[in-house]
Regions:
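Hydrophobic helix-cap positions at the C-terminus of alpha-helices
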Residues: 3-4, 32
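Conserved, well-folded catalytic cores of nucleic-acid-processing
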Residues: 35, 60, 94, 118, ...
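Alpha-helical scaffold elements adjacent to nucleotide-binding pockets in ATP/GTP-utilizing enzyme cores
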Residues: 28, 49-60, 84-87, 110, ...
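Pre-Walker A (Motif I) flank of P-loop NTPase domains
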Residues: 6-13, 38-39, 81-83
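Conserved Walker A/P-loop ATP-binding site and its immediately adjacent core
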Residues: 19-69, 89-93
Length: 181
């Protein structure tokens, strides 16, 4: 990484379990901090793994900080003196402290540990499931609202969902469809 990929963006580090991905990610971020290129964030798929990474960083003398109990950023992270260690739900939610639009916390480099698990958690956080049996009126309203977009994805599946209450099909409403309503 240091010799060949240091200046590149959007890198994927792929190693087998137990081969040191966590330490490599922490060292990559530490090198960015050493060069004055902070703030840096290390994202884990869950709080349990974030706790493990915290202790591993401490074991190797890598300075990490955590979001405070009152949900604010520690100064050593903001100043680029420590890696912020957090988990995906802290970042991807409707009330993220990282901010939106012009009110946001600048971050220079991010390492996402176990990206597949993080992406699954993000997807789940932004997924709304409506049970036809428990919320028939709401279910019908949503299906009607997005009928054209859902038919474009697959008319047969749409008909199965519309006519057969026990069918186990799932159709996703694309994000861009929200701008059509």
């Amino acid at each position: 990484w240091n010799d060949i990929h240091r200046g590149k963006r959007d890198l994927v580090v792929k190693l087998h379990t137990g081969e040191g991905k966590t330490l490599i990610g922490l060292l990559m971020l530490q090198s960015k901090l050493n060069e004055g290129e902070g703030p840096c964030v290390y994202i884990c798929p869950n709080k349990f793994l974030a706790d493990q990474v915290y202790y591993e960083a401490k074991k190797f003398g890598i300075k990490v900080s955590l979001i405070t109990e009152n949900n604010t950023f520690p100064n050593d992270f903001i100043d680029g003196n420590a890696i912020l260690l957090t988990y995906v739900q802290k970042i991807f939610n409707g009330k993220t402290i990282f901010g939106l639009d012009n009110q946001y916390q600048k971050v220079n480099t991010i390492v996402m540990d176990d990206a597949h698990a993080c992406l699954d958690a993000i997807k789940q956080a932004y997924t709304v499931r409506i049970s036809r049996r428990r919320n028939e009126s709401m279910y019908s309203d949503i299906v009607g609202l997005f009928e054209d977009v859902l038919k474009e994805q697959g008319e047969g599946t749409f008909v199965d969902i519309q006519e057969n209450e026990d069918y186990e099909s799932i159709m996703l409403i694309p994000y861009w469809a929200l701008s059509l309503i």
